[in-house]
Curated annotation (Swiss-Prot):
Localization in the cell: Cytoplasm
Gene field: smpB
One GO molecular-function entry: RNA binding
Key word DNA repair present: no
Gene Ontology CC: cytosol
Protein name: SsrA-binding protein
InterPro entries for this protein: SmpB, SsrA-bd_prot, SsrA-bd_prot_CS
Length: 148
């Protein structure tokens, strides 16, 4: 079950591969995500050394968040993956012109996980072509309903 989706990522990128990654979160962040107060539309993923981080993910703290903890809604959060997966992703990002984008946040066995995608950017004509295909599929469905 998805908590938050990044539909903009599917519009702007061709998603080649998907990976599930854990997130290093603080307690107040988990509570806020469970309440649906997170946004990953502007988020992006970077590689620093042998580690992968997500930047720009905004988690709005709940009003009941502790007063003696400084809450930073857009702090850099580390992604948890196996070493072999990290090595494979780093290789593709550095060599093949791919980028990493967050696709969604979801639960897996009670934990908050992020689905990240290995993606290539779409050109403007690719986006227009996808929109034409989507419109044609809608029109076909509409015509089928009218005939039936």
């Amino acid at each position: 079950m998805s908590i938050i989706d990044n539909r903009k990522a599917y519009h702007d990128y061709f998603i080649e591969e998907k990976y599930e990654a854990g997130l290093v979160l603080e307690g107040w962040e988990v509570k806020a995500i469970r309440a649906g107060r997170a946004n990953i539309k502007e988020a992006y993923i970077i590689v620093r050394g042998e580690e992968i981080f997500i930047l720009g993910m905004h988690i709005t703290p709940l009003a009941s968040a502790s007063t003696h903890i400084r809450t930073d809604p857009t702090r850099t959060r580390k992604l948890l993956l196996h070493g072999a997966e990290i090595a494979r992703l780093i290789g593709k990002v550095e060599r093949a012109g791919f980028t990493l984008v967050p696709l969604d946040l979801h639960y897996a066995k009670g934990r908050v996980k992020a689905e990240i995608g290995l993606a290539k950017g779409k050109k403007q004509y690719d986006k227009r072509e996808d929109e034409k295909k989507r419109d044609w599929e809608r029109e076909k469905q509409r015509l089928m309903r009218v005939k039936a």
